[in-house]
Amino acid sequence: MEAILPHGDEPSPLEIPPWNDLKPQTNPVYEEAADIRAIKIVVSVTLGVTLLLAAGYLAAVVISDGAILLRPSELALERHEAYESLVNHPQDDLRGNGVVVCIVDSGIDTTHSDLADARMGGWKDFVNGRTTPYDDHGHGTSMAGILVANGWLKGVANEVELLVAKALGANGSGDDGVVAQAIDWCVSSGAHVVSLSLGGAPGILPFSFGGGDRSSGDAANDAIDEGVYIVAAAGNDGGENDDGDVAHPASEASVIAVGGVTLQGTHWSGSSEGDNNGRILPLPVLLPRNDPDRKPEVVAPAEAVPVLLNDGSWGLADGTSAATVYVTGAIALLLESKPELIPGENAGNAENVETVKQWLMDSVTPQEGQAGHDDQYGYGLLNIRALLDASQG
């Protein structure tokens, strides 16, 4: 079992640091793919005057029947709506009904008011073995909210049946083998889509000689063979420290790797780029990829995305974690509209996964002047309405 350390600790030669500090030659290890800025709120009521101290004004206080109620500010709600518009959310009857989505993350705080109507279908704690859902980090709650919130914030597909596998610990990191177990559990529990807002450094070689622990890539590929859709974060090492490829297991060919954009639809600078040309040096080895499997495949909101916090309030999240859940939700809406693509005894298979990836490639909104795949922008920006239309052929 690989040792996991929080940020700032110096690892010994036998220990592995969090994933966004990893060099290409290290083994995969996971941490949350978002930088969540918690909003600390202090409310004081004196002589009928309500004072709110909230970084970024992400929350507001309402006095109702003598009670103090917390809610997102208009600024946060407007930003939420702007991102829905950016990805062309259909805002119609499709809400993910009949679709089972599994989130592998740090857990979920089901007591948040915006998650009161979440349709929890299953929970498994691979870290501490607890039987009741909880989140001792907060990242999982934030990601779940993007998908299934149904309060002040509205999730992309908030009527899906939600499974949650806790594979990340209180420091936000976890072991690749545990993530693999979590993916296997998702599939055995009936998930149609698995959402992985996490990632690790790729291995030195793009293949295995056998032996050792089962990897998250192995689990993802086995799931895809059964027709389960795997969506994973491209990673947050964009810029001068970018290692030239997306994180693992997003780097697996049939996994849908999701990069990030700003509210203006431009490339988010922290989003990992993908190298679709193949290379030998510098390590890791990257083999050439072909359409529709070039990395990342698609980009979605990743900068200051309004999210739920596990203290019952709201915050902003930067990272391809958030972008991943937007694409997960889009696929859930697609499966609701075309249930014949849902994995099952007489339905889903790996060919369906490639078909959906092709529709994604055909329906995205490319950046101005873009022709074909871009290593930072993928095939383009998620366009949910166009994806649904493309599926109707």
Spans of model-derived segments:
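N-terminal targeting leaders characterized by basic, low-complexity, disordered sequences
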Residues: 1-21
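Substrate-binding/access-modulating region of protease and related hydrolase catalytic domains
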Residues: 2-8, 33-36, 58-60, 167-254, ...
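N-terminal domain-start motif of subtilase-like serine proteases
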Residues: 29-47, 63-102, 128-134, 271, ...
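Subtilisin-like serine protease catalytic core
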Residues: 89-121, 131-175, 251-254, 264-265, ...
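Extracellular S/T/G-rich loop segment that most often corresponds to the catalytic His/Ser-adjacent loop
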Residues: 100, 105, 247-336
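Structural recognition of the beta-strand scaffold that forms the well-ordered cores
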Residues: 100-103, 161-166, 192-197, 224, ...
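Solvent-exposed loop/turn segments at secondary-structure junctions
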Residues: 107-110, 126-127, 153, 168-172, ...
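Hydrolase catalytic cores
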Residues: 163, 167-168, 302-373
